[in-house]
From Swiss-Prot:
Post-translational modification: Contains 2 disulfide bonds that can be either 'C1-C3, C2-C4' or 'C1-C4, C2-C3', since these disulfide connectivities have been observed for conotoxins with cysteine framework V (for examples, see AC P0DQQ7 and AC P81755).
Molecular function, one GO term: toxin activity
Coiled coil stretches, renumbered: none
Domain notes: The cysteine framework is V (CC-CC).
An annotated GO cellular component: extracellular region
Signal peptide: 1-22
Modification type Cysteine amide: residues: 60
Record's subcellular location: Secreted
Keyword terms: Amidation, Cleavage on pair of basic residues, Disulfide bond, G-protein coupled receptor impairing toxin, Secreted, Signal, Toxin
Expression sites by tissue: Expressed by the venom duct.
Purpose of the protein: Has the ability to interact with the G-protein coupled somatostatin type 3 receptor (SSTR3). The ability was measured in competition binding experiments and the constant of inhibition (Ki) has been evaluated to be 3.5 uM.
Protein family (similarity comment): Belongs to the conotoxin T superfamily.
Protein name, as recorded: Conotoxin LiC32
Phylogenetic placement of the source organism: Eukaryota, Metazoa, Spiralia, Lophotrochozoa, Mollusca
Length: 61
């Protein structure tokens, strides 16, 4: 039972680890990569605003 909290913490940390692309980006991949970067940035901003607004109403904007 002592391993369960450690396993949960490791499970939560694993998605935040940086990912490495196996294939180098080509000219055709650049628009798709920038789209993914924009989507990721937008989701991160929405996630931060959600947690911020839950804790501190002043920081919502």
């Amino acid at each position: 039972m002592r391993c369960v909290p450690v396993f949960i913490i490791l499970l939560l940390l694993s998605p935040s680890a940086p990912s490495v692309d196996a294939h180098p980006k080509t000219k055709d991949d650049v628009p798709l990569a920038s789209f993914h970067d924009d989507a990721k940035r937008t989701l991160q901003r929405l996630w931060q605003n959600t947690w911020c607004c839950r804790d501190h109403l002043r920081c919502c904007g």
